[in-house]
Swiss-Prot record:
InterPro entries hit by this protein: RNaseA (IPR001427), RNaseA-like_dom_sf (IPR036816), RNaseA_AS (IPR023411), RNaseA_domain (IPR023412)
GO terms for cellular component: actin cytoskeleton; angiogenin-PRI complex; basement membrane; chromosome; cytoplasm; cytoplasmic stress granule; cytosol; endocytic vesicle
Record gene name: ANG
Pfam family, one: RnaseA
Protein name: Angiogenin
Active site: H37, H138
Phenotype when changing K41E: In ALS9; reduced ribonucleolytic activity
Impact upon substituting P20Q: In ALS9; uncertain significance
Effect of N92A: Slightly decreases binding affinity for RNH1
Effect of mutating D46G: In ALS9; homodimerization is similar to wild-type; localization in the nucleus is similar to the wild-type; strongly reduces ribonucleolytic activity
Annotated residues for binding of tRNA: R45, D46, C105, V127
Coiled coil: none
Known EC number: 3.1.27.-
Signal peptide (residue range): 1-24
Length: 147
């Protein structure tokens, strides 16, 4: 009986190593996506906005060349990964059915080291994301969608 429990314990421990990533790991990729690309209610959306948010989000050591922030609510962004607000796009990507208010921050100047200077471009775009387990984990691009 003791030997049977030992084998059972060994099988259980080995099985743990073969299980898929946990929900917590999936959520960490989604959380990283939000940190890099989500700002619900931006203040300004001009060059100063870009310089401030890029610094606050830790995207300036070295200076990131370009980054897009999506504005709005998380529920609408998550819905891109479902049929509610997204359609398949290219390989393993989803494109939003609706456009989002976005701000794109582009590095202006030659040095990749702080202080970073950014130029802001504000507009409305459809966004293309990669999804895992129903959550956006990578912003591929934001595009004007032709009617």
């Amino acid at each position: 009986m003791v030997m049977g429990l030992g084998v059972l314990l060994l099988v259980f421990v080995l099985g743990l190593g073969l299980t898929p990533p946990t929900l917590a790991q999936d959520n960490s990729r989604y959380t990283h996506f939000l940190t890099q690309h989500y700002d619900a209610k931006p203040q300004g959306r001009d060059d100063r906005y870009c310089e401030s948010i890029m610094r606050r989000r830790g995207l300036t050591s070295p200076c990131k060349d370009i980054n897009t922030f999506i504005h709005g609510n998380k529920r609408s962004i998550k819905a891109i990964c479902e049929n509610k607000n997204g359609n398949p796009h290219r390989e393993n990507l989803r494109i939003s059915k609706s456009s989002f208010q976005v701000t794109t921050c582009k590095l202006h100047g030659g040095s990749p080291w702080p202080p970073c200077q950014y130029r802001a471009t504000a507009g409305f775009r459809n966004v293309v994301v990669a999804c895992e387990n129903g959550l956006p984990v990578h912003l591929d691009q934001s595009i004007f969608r032709r009617p």
